[in-house]
Amino acid sequence: MKKEFMSRALLLAKKAYEAGEVPVGAVIVKDGEIIAEGYNMREQKQNALSHAEIECINKACEVLKSWRLETCELYVTLEPCPMCTGAIINSRIKTVVFGAYDLKAGSMDSVINLCDYPYNHKPEIYGGIMEDECKEILEIFFQKLR
């Protein structure tokens, strides 16, 4: 687990922020190298599925020419929601590292841990990595909306 990967995800969250999106960024790492990046694009694409994790998983699948990401790690600035957790399970991602906990929709710890259910795959999960930095950009974004 490397902070440099979470730092890169945080830079992508800032890109999302600048685009008027909920500031969440993600990277997928294989063999110590970033192979895919993504950030929230729901407003830009007008697509409810365009969360950072989904964007990133789609790109990683294209790069590897496979839907199986079992040797990959996902770094994301916010705890994944139910949809993204399902995509993580289905794509067999080995490890998930997230920053801020999501008390409203977090599905790896905060609200529910979908990975505790007897699905066919269970990733390793590490939460609260660079939590303050990841939480801060979200707080600023939502304060501006009010």
Identify the meaning behind each predicted range.
Residues N40-Q46, I112:
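Short glycine-enriched, charge-decorated loop/helix-capping segments at active-site entrances
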Residues M1-A19, W67, P80-R146:
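Zinc-dependent deaminase
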Residues R42, V76, A100:
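Residues that line or immediately flank small-molecule/substrate-binding pockets and catalytic motifs
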Residues Q46-S50, I54, N58-A87:
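Helix-adjacent hinge/juxtasegments
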Residues G20-V24, E70:
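Short, basic and Ser/Thr-rich N-terminal targeting/leader segments
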Residues I35-R42, K122:
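Short beta->alpha transition motifs characteristic of CBS
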Residues A9, A13-A16, A26, A36, ...:
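Small-residue (primarily alanine) positions within well-ordered alpha-helices
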Residues V24-G32:
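Short beta-strand scaffold segments in enzyme catalytic cores
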